[in-house]
Amino acid sequence: MSRREDGRQDDELRPVTITRGFTSHPAGSVLIEFGQTRVMCTASATEGVPRWRKGSGLGWLTAEYAMLPASTHTRSDRESVKGRVGGRTQEISRLIGRSLRACIDLSALGENTIAIDCDVLQADGGTRTAAITGAYVALADAVTYLAAHGKLADDEPLSCAIAAVSVGVVDGRVRVDLPYEEDSRAEVDMNVVATDTGTLVEVQGTGEGATFARSTLDKLLDAAVGAADQLFVLQKEALALPYPGVLPDAPQKKAFGS
């Protein structure tokens, strides 16, 4: 197995760090780092649901993704200044929301919403997969917070862990967790969202300028699942530590939002 420019093996993740309690106001707040890619992920509970959801008795989980102006080498204007949200931003926001809704029982929230915000502080490839992986940890902390305050119908609404990783074919080799230098010249580029129960949530794959074989797809998926398993271990280790904020000593069960 060959070494990459950054010294990693083909199947090796960049150094991954998960810091809980990164900010103090949200119920869940995480800084996740995949090498030089750094994303702040927060989870906040808000009362009410979208109009189309009212009367269902079900909660909702939504997500927003954004890149800070100086998160890349060349500064870009905020989308709020441009007056519209770009297609890429909308796509990634929806991906994060879909990924996390796959693991939560929304009926436990009542008609209330968990809002996930993912802000890229520094980008070096794999920002959407880092966002999903970090957002799951923020969501888990938000669930702990809400359960401790007696605001959930079910104190354990999460059915599985969620993590995501980029994989691709670079220089003819299947590699995981691509930095920008590899992502920008990959022959095949793919993002995979997986659960710790062995199932997949989403697979996004593209041949960049050429087609690729079914056997290559299988190799990419195998590599992604193997890398995701490593991320699940890191998530579990991070969440094994005490909740980083203040929880009540003796919560009283009551309806969320009351």
From Swiss-Prot:
User: Does the record carry Isomerase as a key word?
Assistant: no
**Catalysed reaction(s)?**
tRNA(n+1) + phosphate = tRNA(n) + a ribonucleoside 5'-diphosphate
Q: GO: which molecular function terms?
A: 3'-5'-RNA exonuclease activity; tRNA binding; tRNA nucleotidyltransferase activity
Superkingdom, natural source:
Bacteria
Entry binding sites for phosphate: 88, 126-128
Top EC class per UniProt?
transferase
User: Per the UniProt record, which EC number(s) apply here?
Assistant: 2.7.7.56
Is Nucleotidyltransferase one of the keywords UniProt gives this record? yes
Q: Which GO terms describe its biological process?
A: rRNA catabolic process; rRNA processing; tRNA processing
- Mind listing the UniProt keywords for this protein, alphabetically? Nucleotidyltransferase, RNA-binding, rRNA processing, Transferase, tRNA processing, tRNA-binding
The record's listing under Pfam families reads: RNase_PH (PF01138), RNase_PH_C (PF03725)
> NCBIfam families attached here?
RNasePH
Family (UniProt): Belongs to the RNase PH family.
Q: How does it assemble?
A: Homohexameric ring arranged as a trimer of dimers.
Q: What does this protein do?
A: Phosphorolytic 3'-5' exoribonuclease that plays an important role in tRNA 3'-end maturation. Removes nucleotide residues following the 3'-CCA terminus of tRNAs; can also add nucleotides to the ends of RNA molecules by using nucleoside diphosphates as substrates, but this may not be physiologically important. Probably plays a role in initiation of 16S rRNA degradation (leading to ribosome degradation) during starvation.
* Protein name per Swiss-Prot or TrEMBL: Ribonuclease PH
